[in-house]
Amino acid sequence: GVLGGAGLPDALDAALDAARALRGQGWELLPVMSFAAGQDTRFGRGTGWRQQLEGLTGHPVLDTLQAVEPLGPRRLADALVIAPCTGATLARLAEGLSDTPVTLAAKSLLRVGSPIVVAVSTNDGLGASGENIARLYQRKHYYFVPYGQDDPNTKPQSLKARFELLPQTLEAALEGRQLQPVLQCPCG
C-alpha cells in the first residue's frame, strides 16, 4: 500500500497511529507527502513528519511528481490511503487535478483501477468541501474512512475520519466495497 497525506497535526498524529496499525498487520507502506505537509508551520516542522514517516515505513518519502507517477503503471502499490485528506486535497481530487505528489499518486493508481482510501480531515466538510466529498462518492474506486463531526458545538462544519477504522476500510476497499456505516456519531 501507499500512504499519502497532508493536514493538521492532530490528524497527522492520528494518521501515523493508523499507519502503525497497518504496519502491525504486516502491510508494507510507501509514504507520500504533499508539498504542504512538508512545510514548517506553527504546529511543527515538516522534517519532523518526514522523519516519523520514514522511520515507521522504512522507506524514503515520495514527495515529487516524478517519484509517484510510476506507482500505478508499474504496480508498485495495491492502494493509496490519503490520510489525512484536507479540503484542498479533496478539491483537487474532485476536479481531477494531479499537481501534487498525493493527487498524482491517486491519478496513477486510478489508471490501473486501484482503490483510493480517503480519510477526511477538514474544517469545512459540511461547507465548501461537502460538495467535493459528494463528487468523489460518485466516482469509481474512491472509498472513505468512516467520519463524523469532530467538534459539532465549536466547529459545526468540521469533519474528521475515524482513523482507527482505517485498516478495516482499506481491507473493504481492496474487496471493492465501502465500509459501513460511513457516517459516524461525532468523533472526539
Set out the residue ranges of the language-model regions.
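A cross-family phosphate/adenosyl-ligand binding-site feature
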Residues: 1-116, 121-188
